[in-house]
């Protein structure tokens, strides 16, 4: 505010100019989230900035050379959570624009975490963290992903990652995936994985191969930035294998009682 040549602009990423906007340079660092929404500039102290972003709040006193991450502000938005069967069990969560994290359920917040580096939570995927399914036979095998159906099978032990997003066949219309695409491991067989687009897809080998086991279970898509006419939830009966309920964002609920051979609209 006291220097007409000094300009800040933010969105993705955060930039600064010292020459009235003729040239810009990045001032974000590795501990600052890439998506920026607000910036406070101290009128009494040049270089003192407070930045609000998708990761929370960051503060700098030297015009972006170094940033402090303020972890005390609890602003994380979870899209989904799940747990495994370990003892003690782990909690998994997909966060809006902050990836997928996991950690022991019995961890207690400790102010020494930052000093010791012994933070109990671990990030296992980036992007917008979405739903999580864990193989109950081997908790190192985790299925999770980011927005619009970009899911992967993770081996937490080896660090290997395999993309498992279903693809349409040549000549077919592309599938429509919800922002928060649903996935489900069958409670009857942990090799069987379901994933919803506008169709219900089934894999019998943990996502290596897919088959469509339904027709389009929506009223059809609409043009726009975000897909519409998509499946949003999948549930299989824990008692009877092959009894599956599917809901979509246009208000339709379908059920199959024979593993996808026939479907009935019950909405």
Roles of regions detected by a PLM:
Residues 1-267:
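Beta-propeller blade termini and top-face loops
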